[in-house]
Amino acid sequence: MADKACVQRLQKEFKALSREPVPHVVAKPSPSDILEWHFVLEGSEGTPFQGGFYYGKLKFPPDYPFKPPGISMITPNGRFATHKKICMSMSDFHPESWNPMWSVSRLLLQTPVPRAQTAYMGVKKMDNAPTTGSINSTVEEKQLLAKQSLACNVKSATFRKLFPELVDKHNELLRLAKEEVERAAAEAAAKAAAPGTSKSGSEGGSQNSVRSRSKGRKTEESTAGGGGQQRNDAVHAR
């Protein structure tokens, strides 16, 4: 059970975080456990994590802030294994380096997020520097996981409850994707129909032109033949 001082400190930090949010990060304590915080990190532009939304957890000890929290990622990201603690200087892997003056906001800024200003996700060099909890993956694999991240997150009931705005974003992206598919299908159908109609009309026009020229030649031949017969009749009459 959390100490009274721990609960008060975390409540105070949540209020401070609500007033001054960390850019591209959303964090909320669990409604049933103040020691468990859930966060979502947005991937930065120009990185393999662009477009991704990475869901993770902070697990605070009962005597926080005198001891650091544990940090884990839930969303598959290609940089860290899911549901396993991540090793970093501000986590419970290194309690000797922890400073009780550090806040949750600072912790989130230093969390191994998929953003350009941190080296933990291997963004700057696009590498896979090994550390406890890390995994290896290609840039392409990270990009694919980024595209799939929201769809993966909304499967979690806790995520849906804590971050309804991101669920709405996911639904909006699905709607836009559906409209794009329907629009592309309609354009393809229109293009397929247009050449067929034009070709049919062209062929019909060509056939009519051929028939007209053929009819004209027959008329000319008939006229020419009639004139020859009249000349022959005139010769016999003389």
Residue ranges and their predicted role:
Residues 31, 35, 92, 109, ...:
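Short, surface-exposed, charged/polar-biased interaction segments
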Residues 116-238:
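Charge-rich (especially acidic), low-complexity segments
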